[in-house]
Structure formats: structure tokens, C-alpha cells
Amino acid sequence: MATPYREKIEKMSSEVIDSNPYSRLMALKKMGIVNNYENIRNLSVIIVGLGGIGSVAAEMLTRCGIGKLLLFDYDTVEIANMNRLFFRPEQSGKSKTMAAQETLSSINPDVQFESHNYNITTIDNFEHFKGRIEKGGLVEGEPVDLVLGCVDNFEARTAINQACLELGKSWMESGVSENAISGHIQLIIPGESACFQCVPPLIVASGIDERTLKREGVCAASLPTTMGIVAGMLVQNTLKYLLKFGEVSSLLGYNALLDYFPKDNMKPNPECSNSFCIIHQQKYKEFLKNNPKENLIQNNNNNNINNNEKKSTYENEWGIELIETSEDFNNNNNNNNKPSNNSFEFSYDKKPTVELNEQSTVKVNSSSNLEDLMNQLKNMK
């Protein structure tokens, strides 16, 4: 275990001094963004998978001062992992959980760490994993506050989904595409939003064993930039969810080719194959029936973000004034390269091309449509 570079700090302080690692985090309170940032010390999070997303997410939460992190992985650090963030070459051969805990505890000794070096998909390990969700909180015997899924296969995602459904625990799923140019995060609240099995991926719907698709010498692409962006999206959503500020995204994607961030809300499937999901759906319907004034989580968060924007405009000790919101910016800067809807099926819109001779030219700009192009072609000689 690495020796910490400083003594533990019992209580977060907003005092602006060089030796205070929390002063810039606590400034969020002064800016009117977060009302209770110090509450992060009372929260616990499970991270399953310490790959390109999970390891970076663990570091971010550690630097943010989370109360407790429970780390799950059964893999070892390899030189092939060095194209990503976090792990170092000298840690090669160590279990990812051990290497991660060594690094993270040296970054912030205030955080409690618990590491488990096993595969959660086996029967015995699954029961232990579920037990840590239920009783592995900051105070032993209490549940953790959130589970983050940062795994790269369907089997592990299904195990996390099953454990959280059985316990009624919310979790966030994340992933990056095999070509490394897109990714997503998804908040899964049992009964309120789609669980992982509500809309199964094609590989499962087709009845294919994903293990048969792995070929020797062939691997998925990996970019540290995409991994870092998705990890940032995941932790940002985690902070908003746990500290109750801003708008918590239900489903947020990222397309690196267009720098496009689509959003959507995934409703639960009433014909989901998971019986626990159906039970939670029925409970949530009953809850809404008995509480007609209750809105879905998206509406609640929309109200929160509007209130926070108004508050942060003027109410801070530095007198900083907000002159433009992201909504204003989007309205004033139309980008026709981006689709007008929030479809996650969109990947790349190929620009129209026209073959011309040396004397002929056709001007094509971002606002050109098919009719304009046809008129220009007809006028050519």
C-alpha cells in the first residue's frame, strides 16, 4: 500500500489555502451550483470494471472526495492497457483492483477503499457482490448509494442488472463502441426506466454466444480520449444524481466523429423478460397512481437546473454574471451537421458530392438542400 502524502482531513473546508485539496470543490457551493457538496463524504459507490472507463471514473470520484469506493474486477494490468489512462507500466502483472487501490489511496487518503478481485458472474461471487451492494455502504450494514457498471461484456452487465433489480437499487451503465469513436451512459432506476434487459442488444436477441465472436489476434479499438470523455460523462451524472443538482441524464450518448451528444429517455418494456423488472414497473405505476403530483425524474431535474441557473447568475460572492446558457448558445449557433432529432441510430451523415469538369463549379454550403443543388446543376453549361 502506498504511503499517503498527507494526513487525513476529517472535515471538508472551503478555506482557500494551498494545502486544502477541497477548496476548489467547495467553491461550487459559493457559486450556487451545489448546496451540500460536503455530503459527498457520506456517500459510497461501487465500480464494477476497472478498464478504460472504470479506472478513470474511480480516480475522478477519489479526487472529488467520495466517502467510500468499492472496486470489482478480476483482470490484471497489462502493457497493452497503457494506451489508456490511469495505470502505469510498473504496475503490469498486478491485479487491477490492487493497483487501483494503491494509486487512489495515495491520491486521497480520506477515501475508504474496498477491493474485490473476482468475476461477479459466477454463482458464489454474484451472491457476495449482491451482498456488498446491500450492506457495503460507508457504515457497514447499510446499502451503497449507487452502482456504476463499467464492464465490456453482456454477461457482466446482466449480472449487475440482475443484482440491482433484486435489491431495487439504481445503477448507471456505461460503454464505448468497438471502434472507439462513440460511447454512452445510462441511468437505470428499477421500474421507472428501462433495465438492461428491456431492450437487449442484437447479439443477444440473435441468440449468439458472444464468446464465439472473439478471435485470436483481433481486438476492439481503444482511444484514451473517448474513454476519458465517457468516464467524465459518467462521473458528472453520478455527482448530479447523488448531490441532487442539475439535470440527471437518463441516456446520454457521444459520437466522436461529429462531437454530438444525443439524449433520450428509455421507458421500461412492459414485456421485459426479467420478472423483477415487471414487479418494479407495477410498483412504480402504483406509486404514480397514489402520488399524481409526482413527476418523472427528468421533469424534476429540469426544474432543478432552471433554478440553479437563475441562482448562479447573481448570487455568488464574486459577482460573476451568467450571460449565456447552453440553450441560448444552441439556439444561436445552428449546426446542420447534427441531426435534428435525438436518435441514437445516427452515426454519420455523408455530405453530397458532385463530379465536375475543370470549368464547372457548384457551390455547396451547410444550408444547401437537394432542390438548390439541382437548380445549380441545371444552370451549368
Swiss-Prot record:
Catalytic-site annotation from UniProt: 219 (glycyl thioester intermediate)
* Record keywords, A-Z: ATP-binding, Metal-binding, Nucleotide-binding, Ubl conjugation pathway, Zinc
| Residues binding Zn(2+) | 195, 198, 272, 277
The answer to keyword Nucleotide-binding applying to this record is yes
SUPFAM superfamilies, sorted: Activating enzymes of the ubiquitin-like proteins
Record-level Gene Ontology MF annotations? ATP binding; metal ion binding; UFM1 activating enzyme activity
Q: Which Gene3D superfamilies does this entry report, sorted A to Z?
A: NAD(P)-binding Rossmann-like Domain (3.40.50.720)
Q: Where does ATP bind?
A: 52, 73, 96, 119, 153
| Biological process annotations from GO | protein ufmylation
Q: Name one GO cellular component term.
A: cytoplasm
Checking InterPro entries in the record gives: ThiF/MoeB/HesA, ThiF_NAD_FAD-bd, Ubiquitin-activating_enz
Q: Which domain of life is it from?
A: Eukaryota
Role according to the record: E1-like enzyme which activates ufm1.
- Recorded family membership: Belongs to the ubiquitin-activating E1 family. UBA5 subfamily.
Name under which the protein is recorded? Ubiquitin-like modifier-activating enzyme 5
Record organism = Dictyostelium discoideum (Social amoeba)
Gene for this protein?
uba5
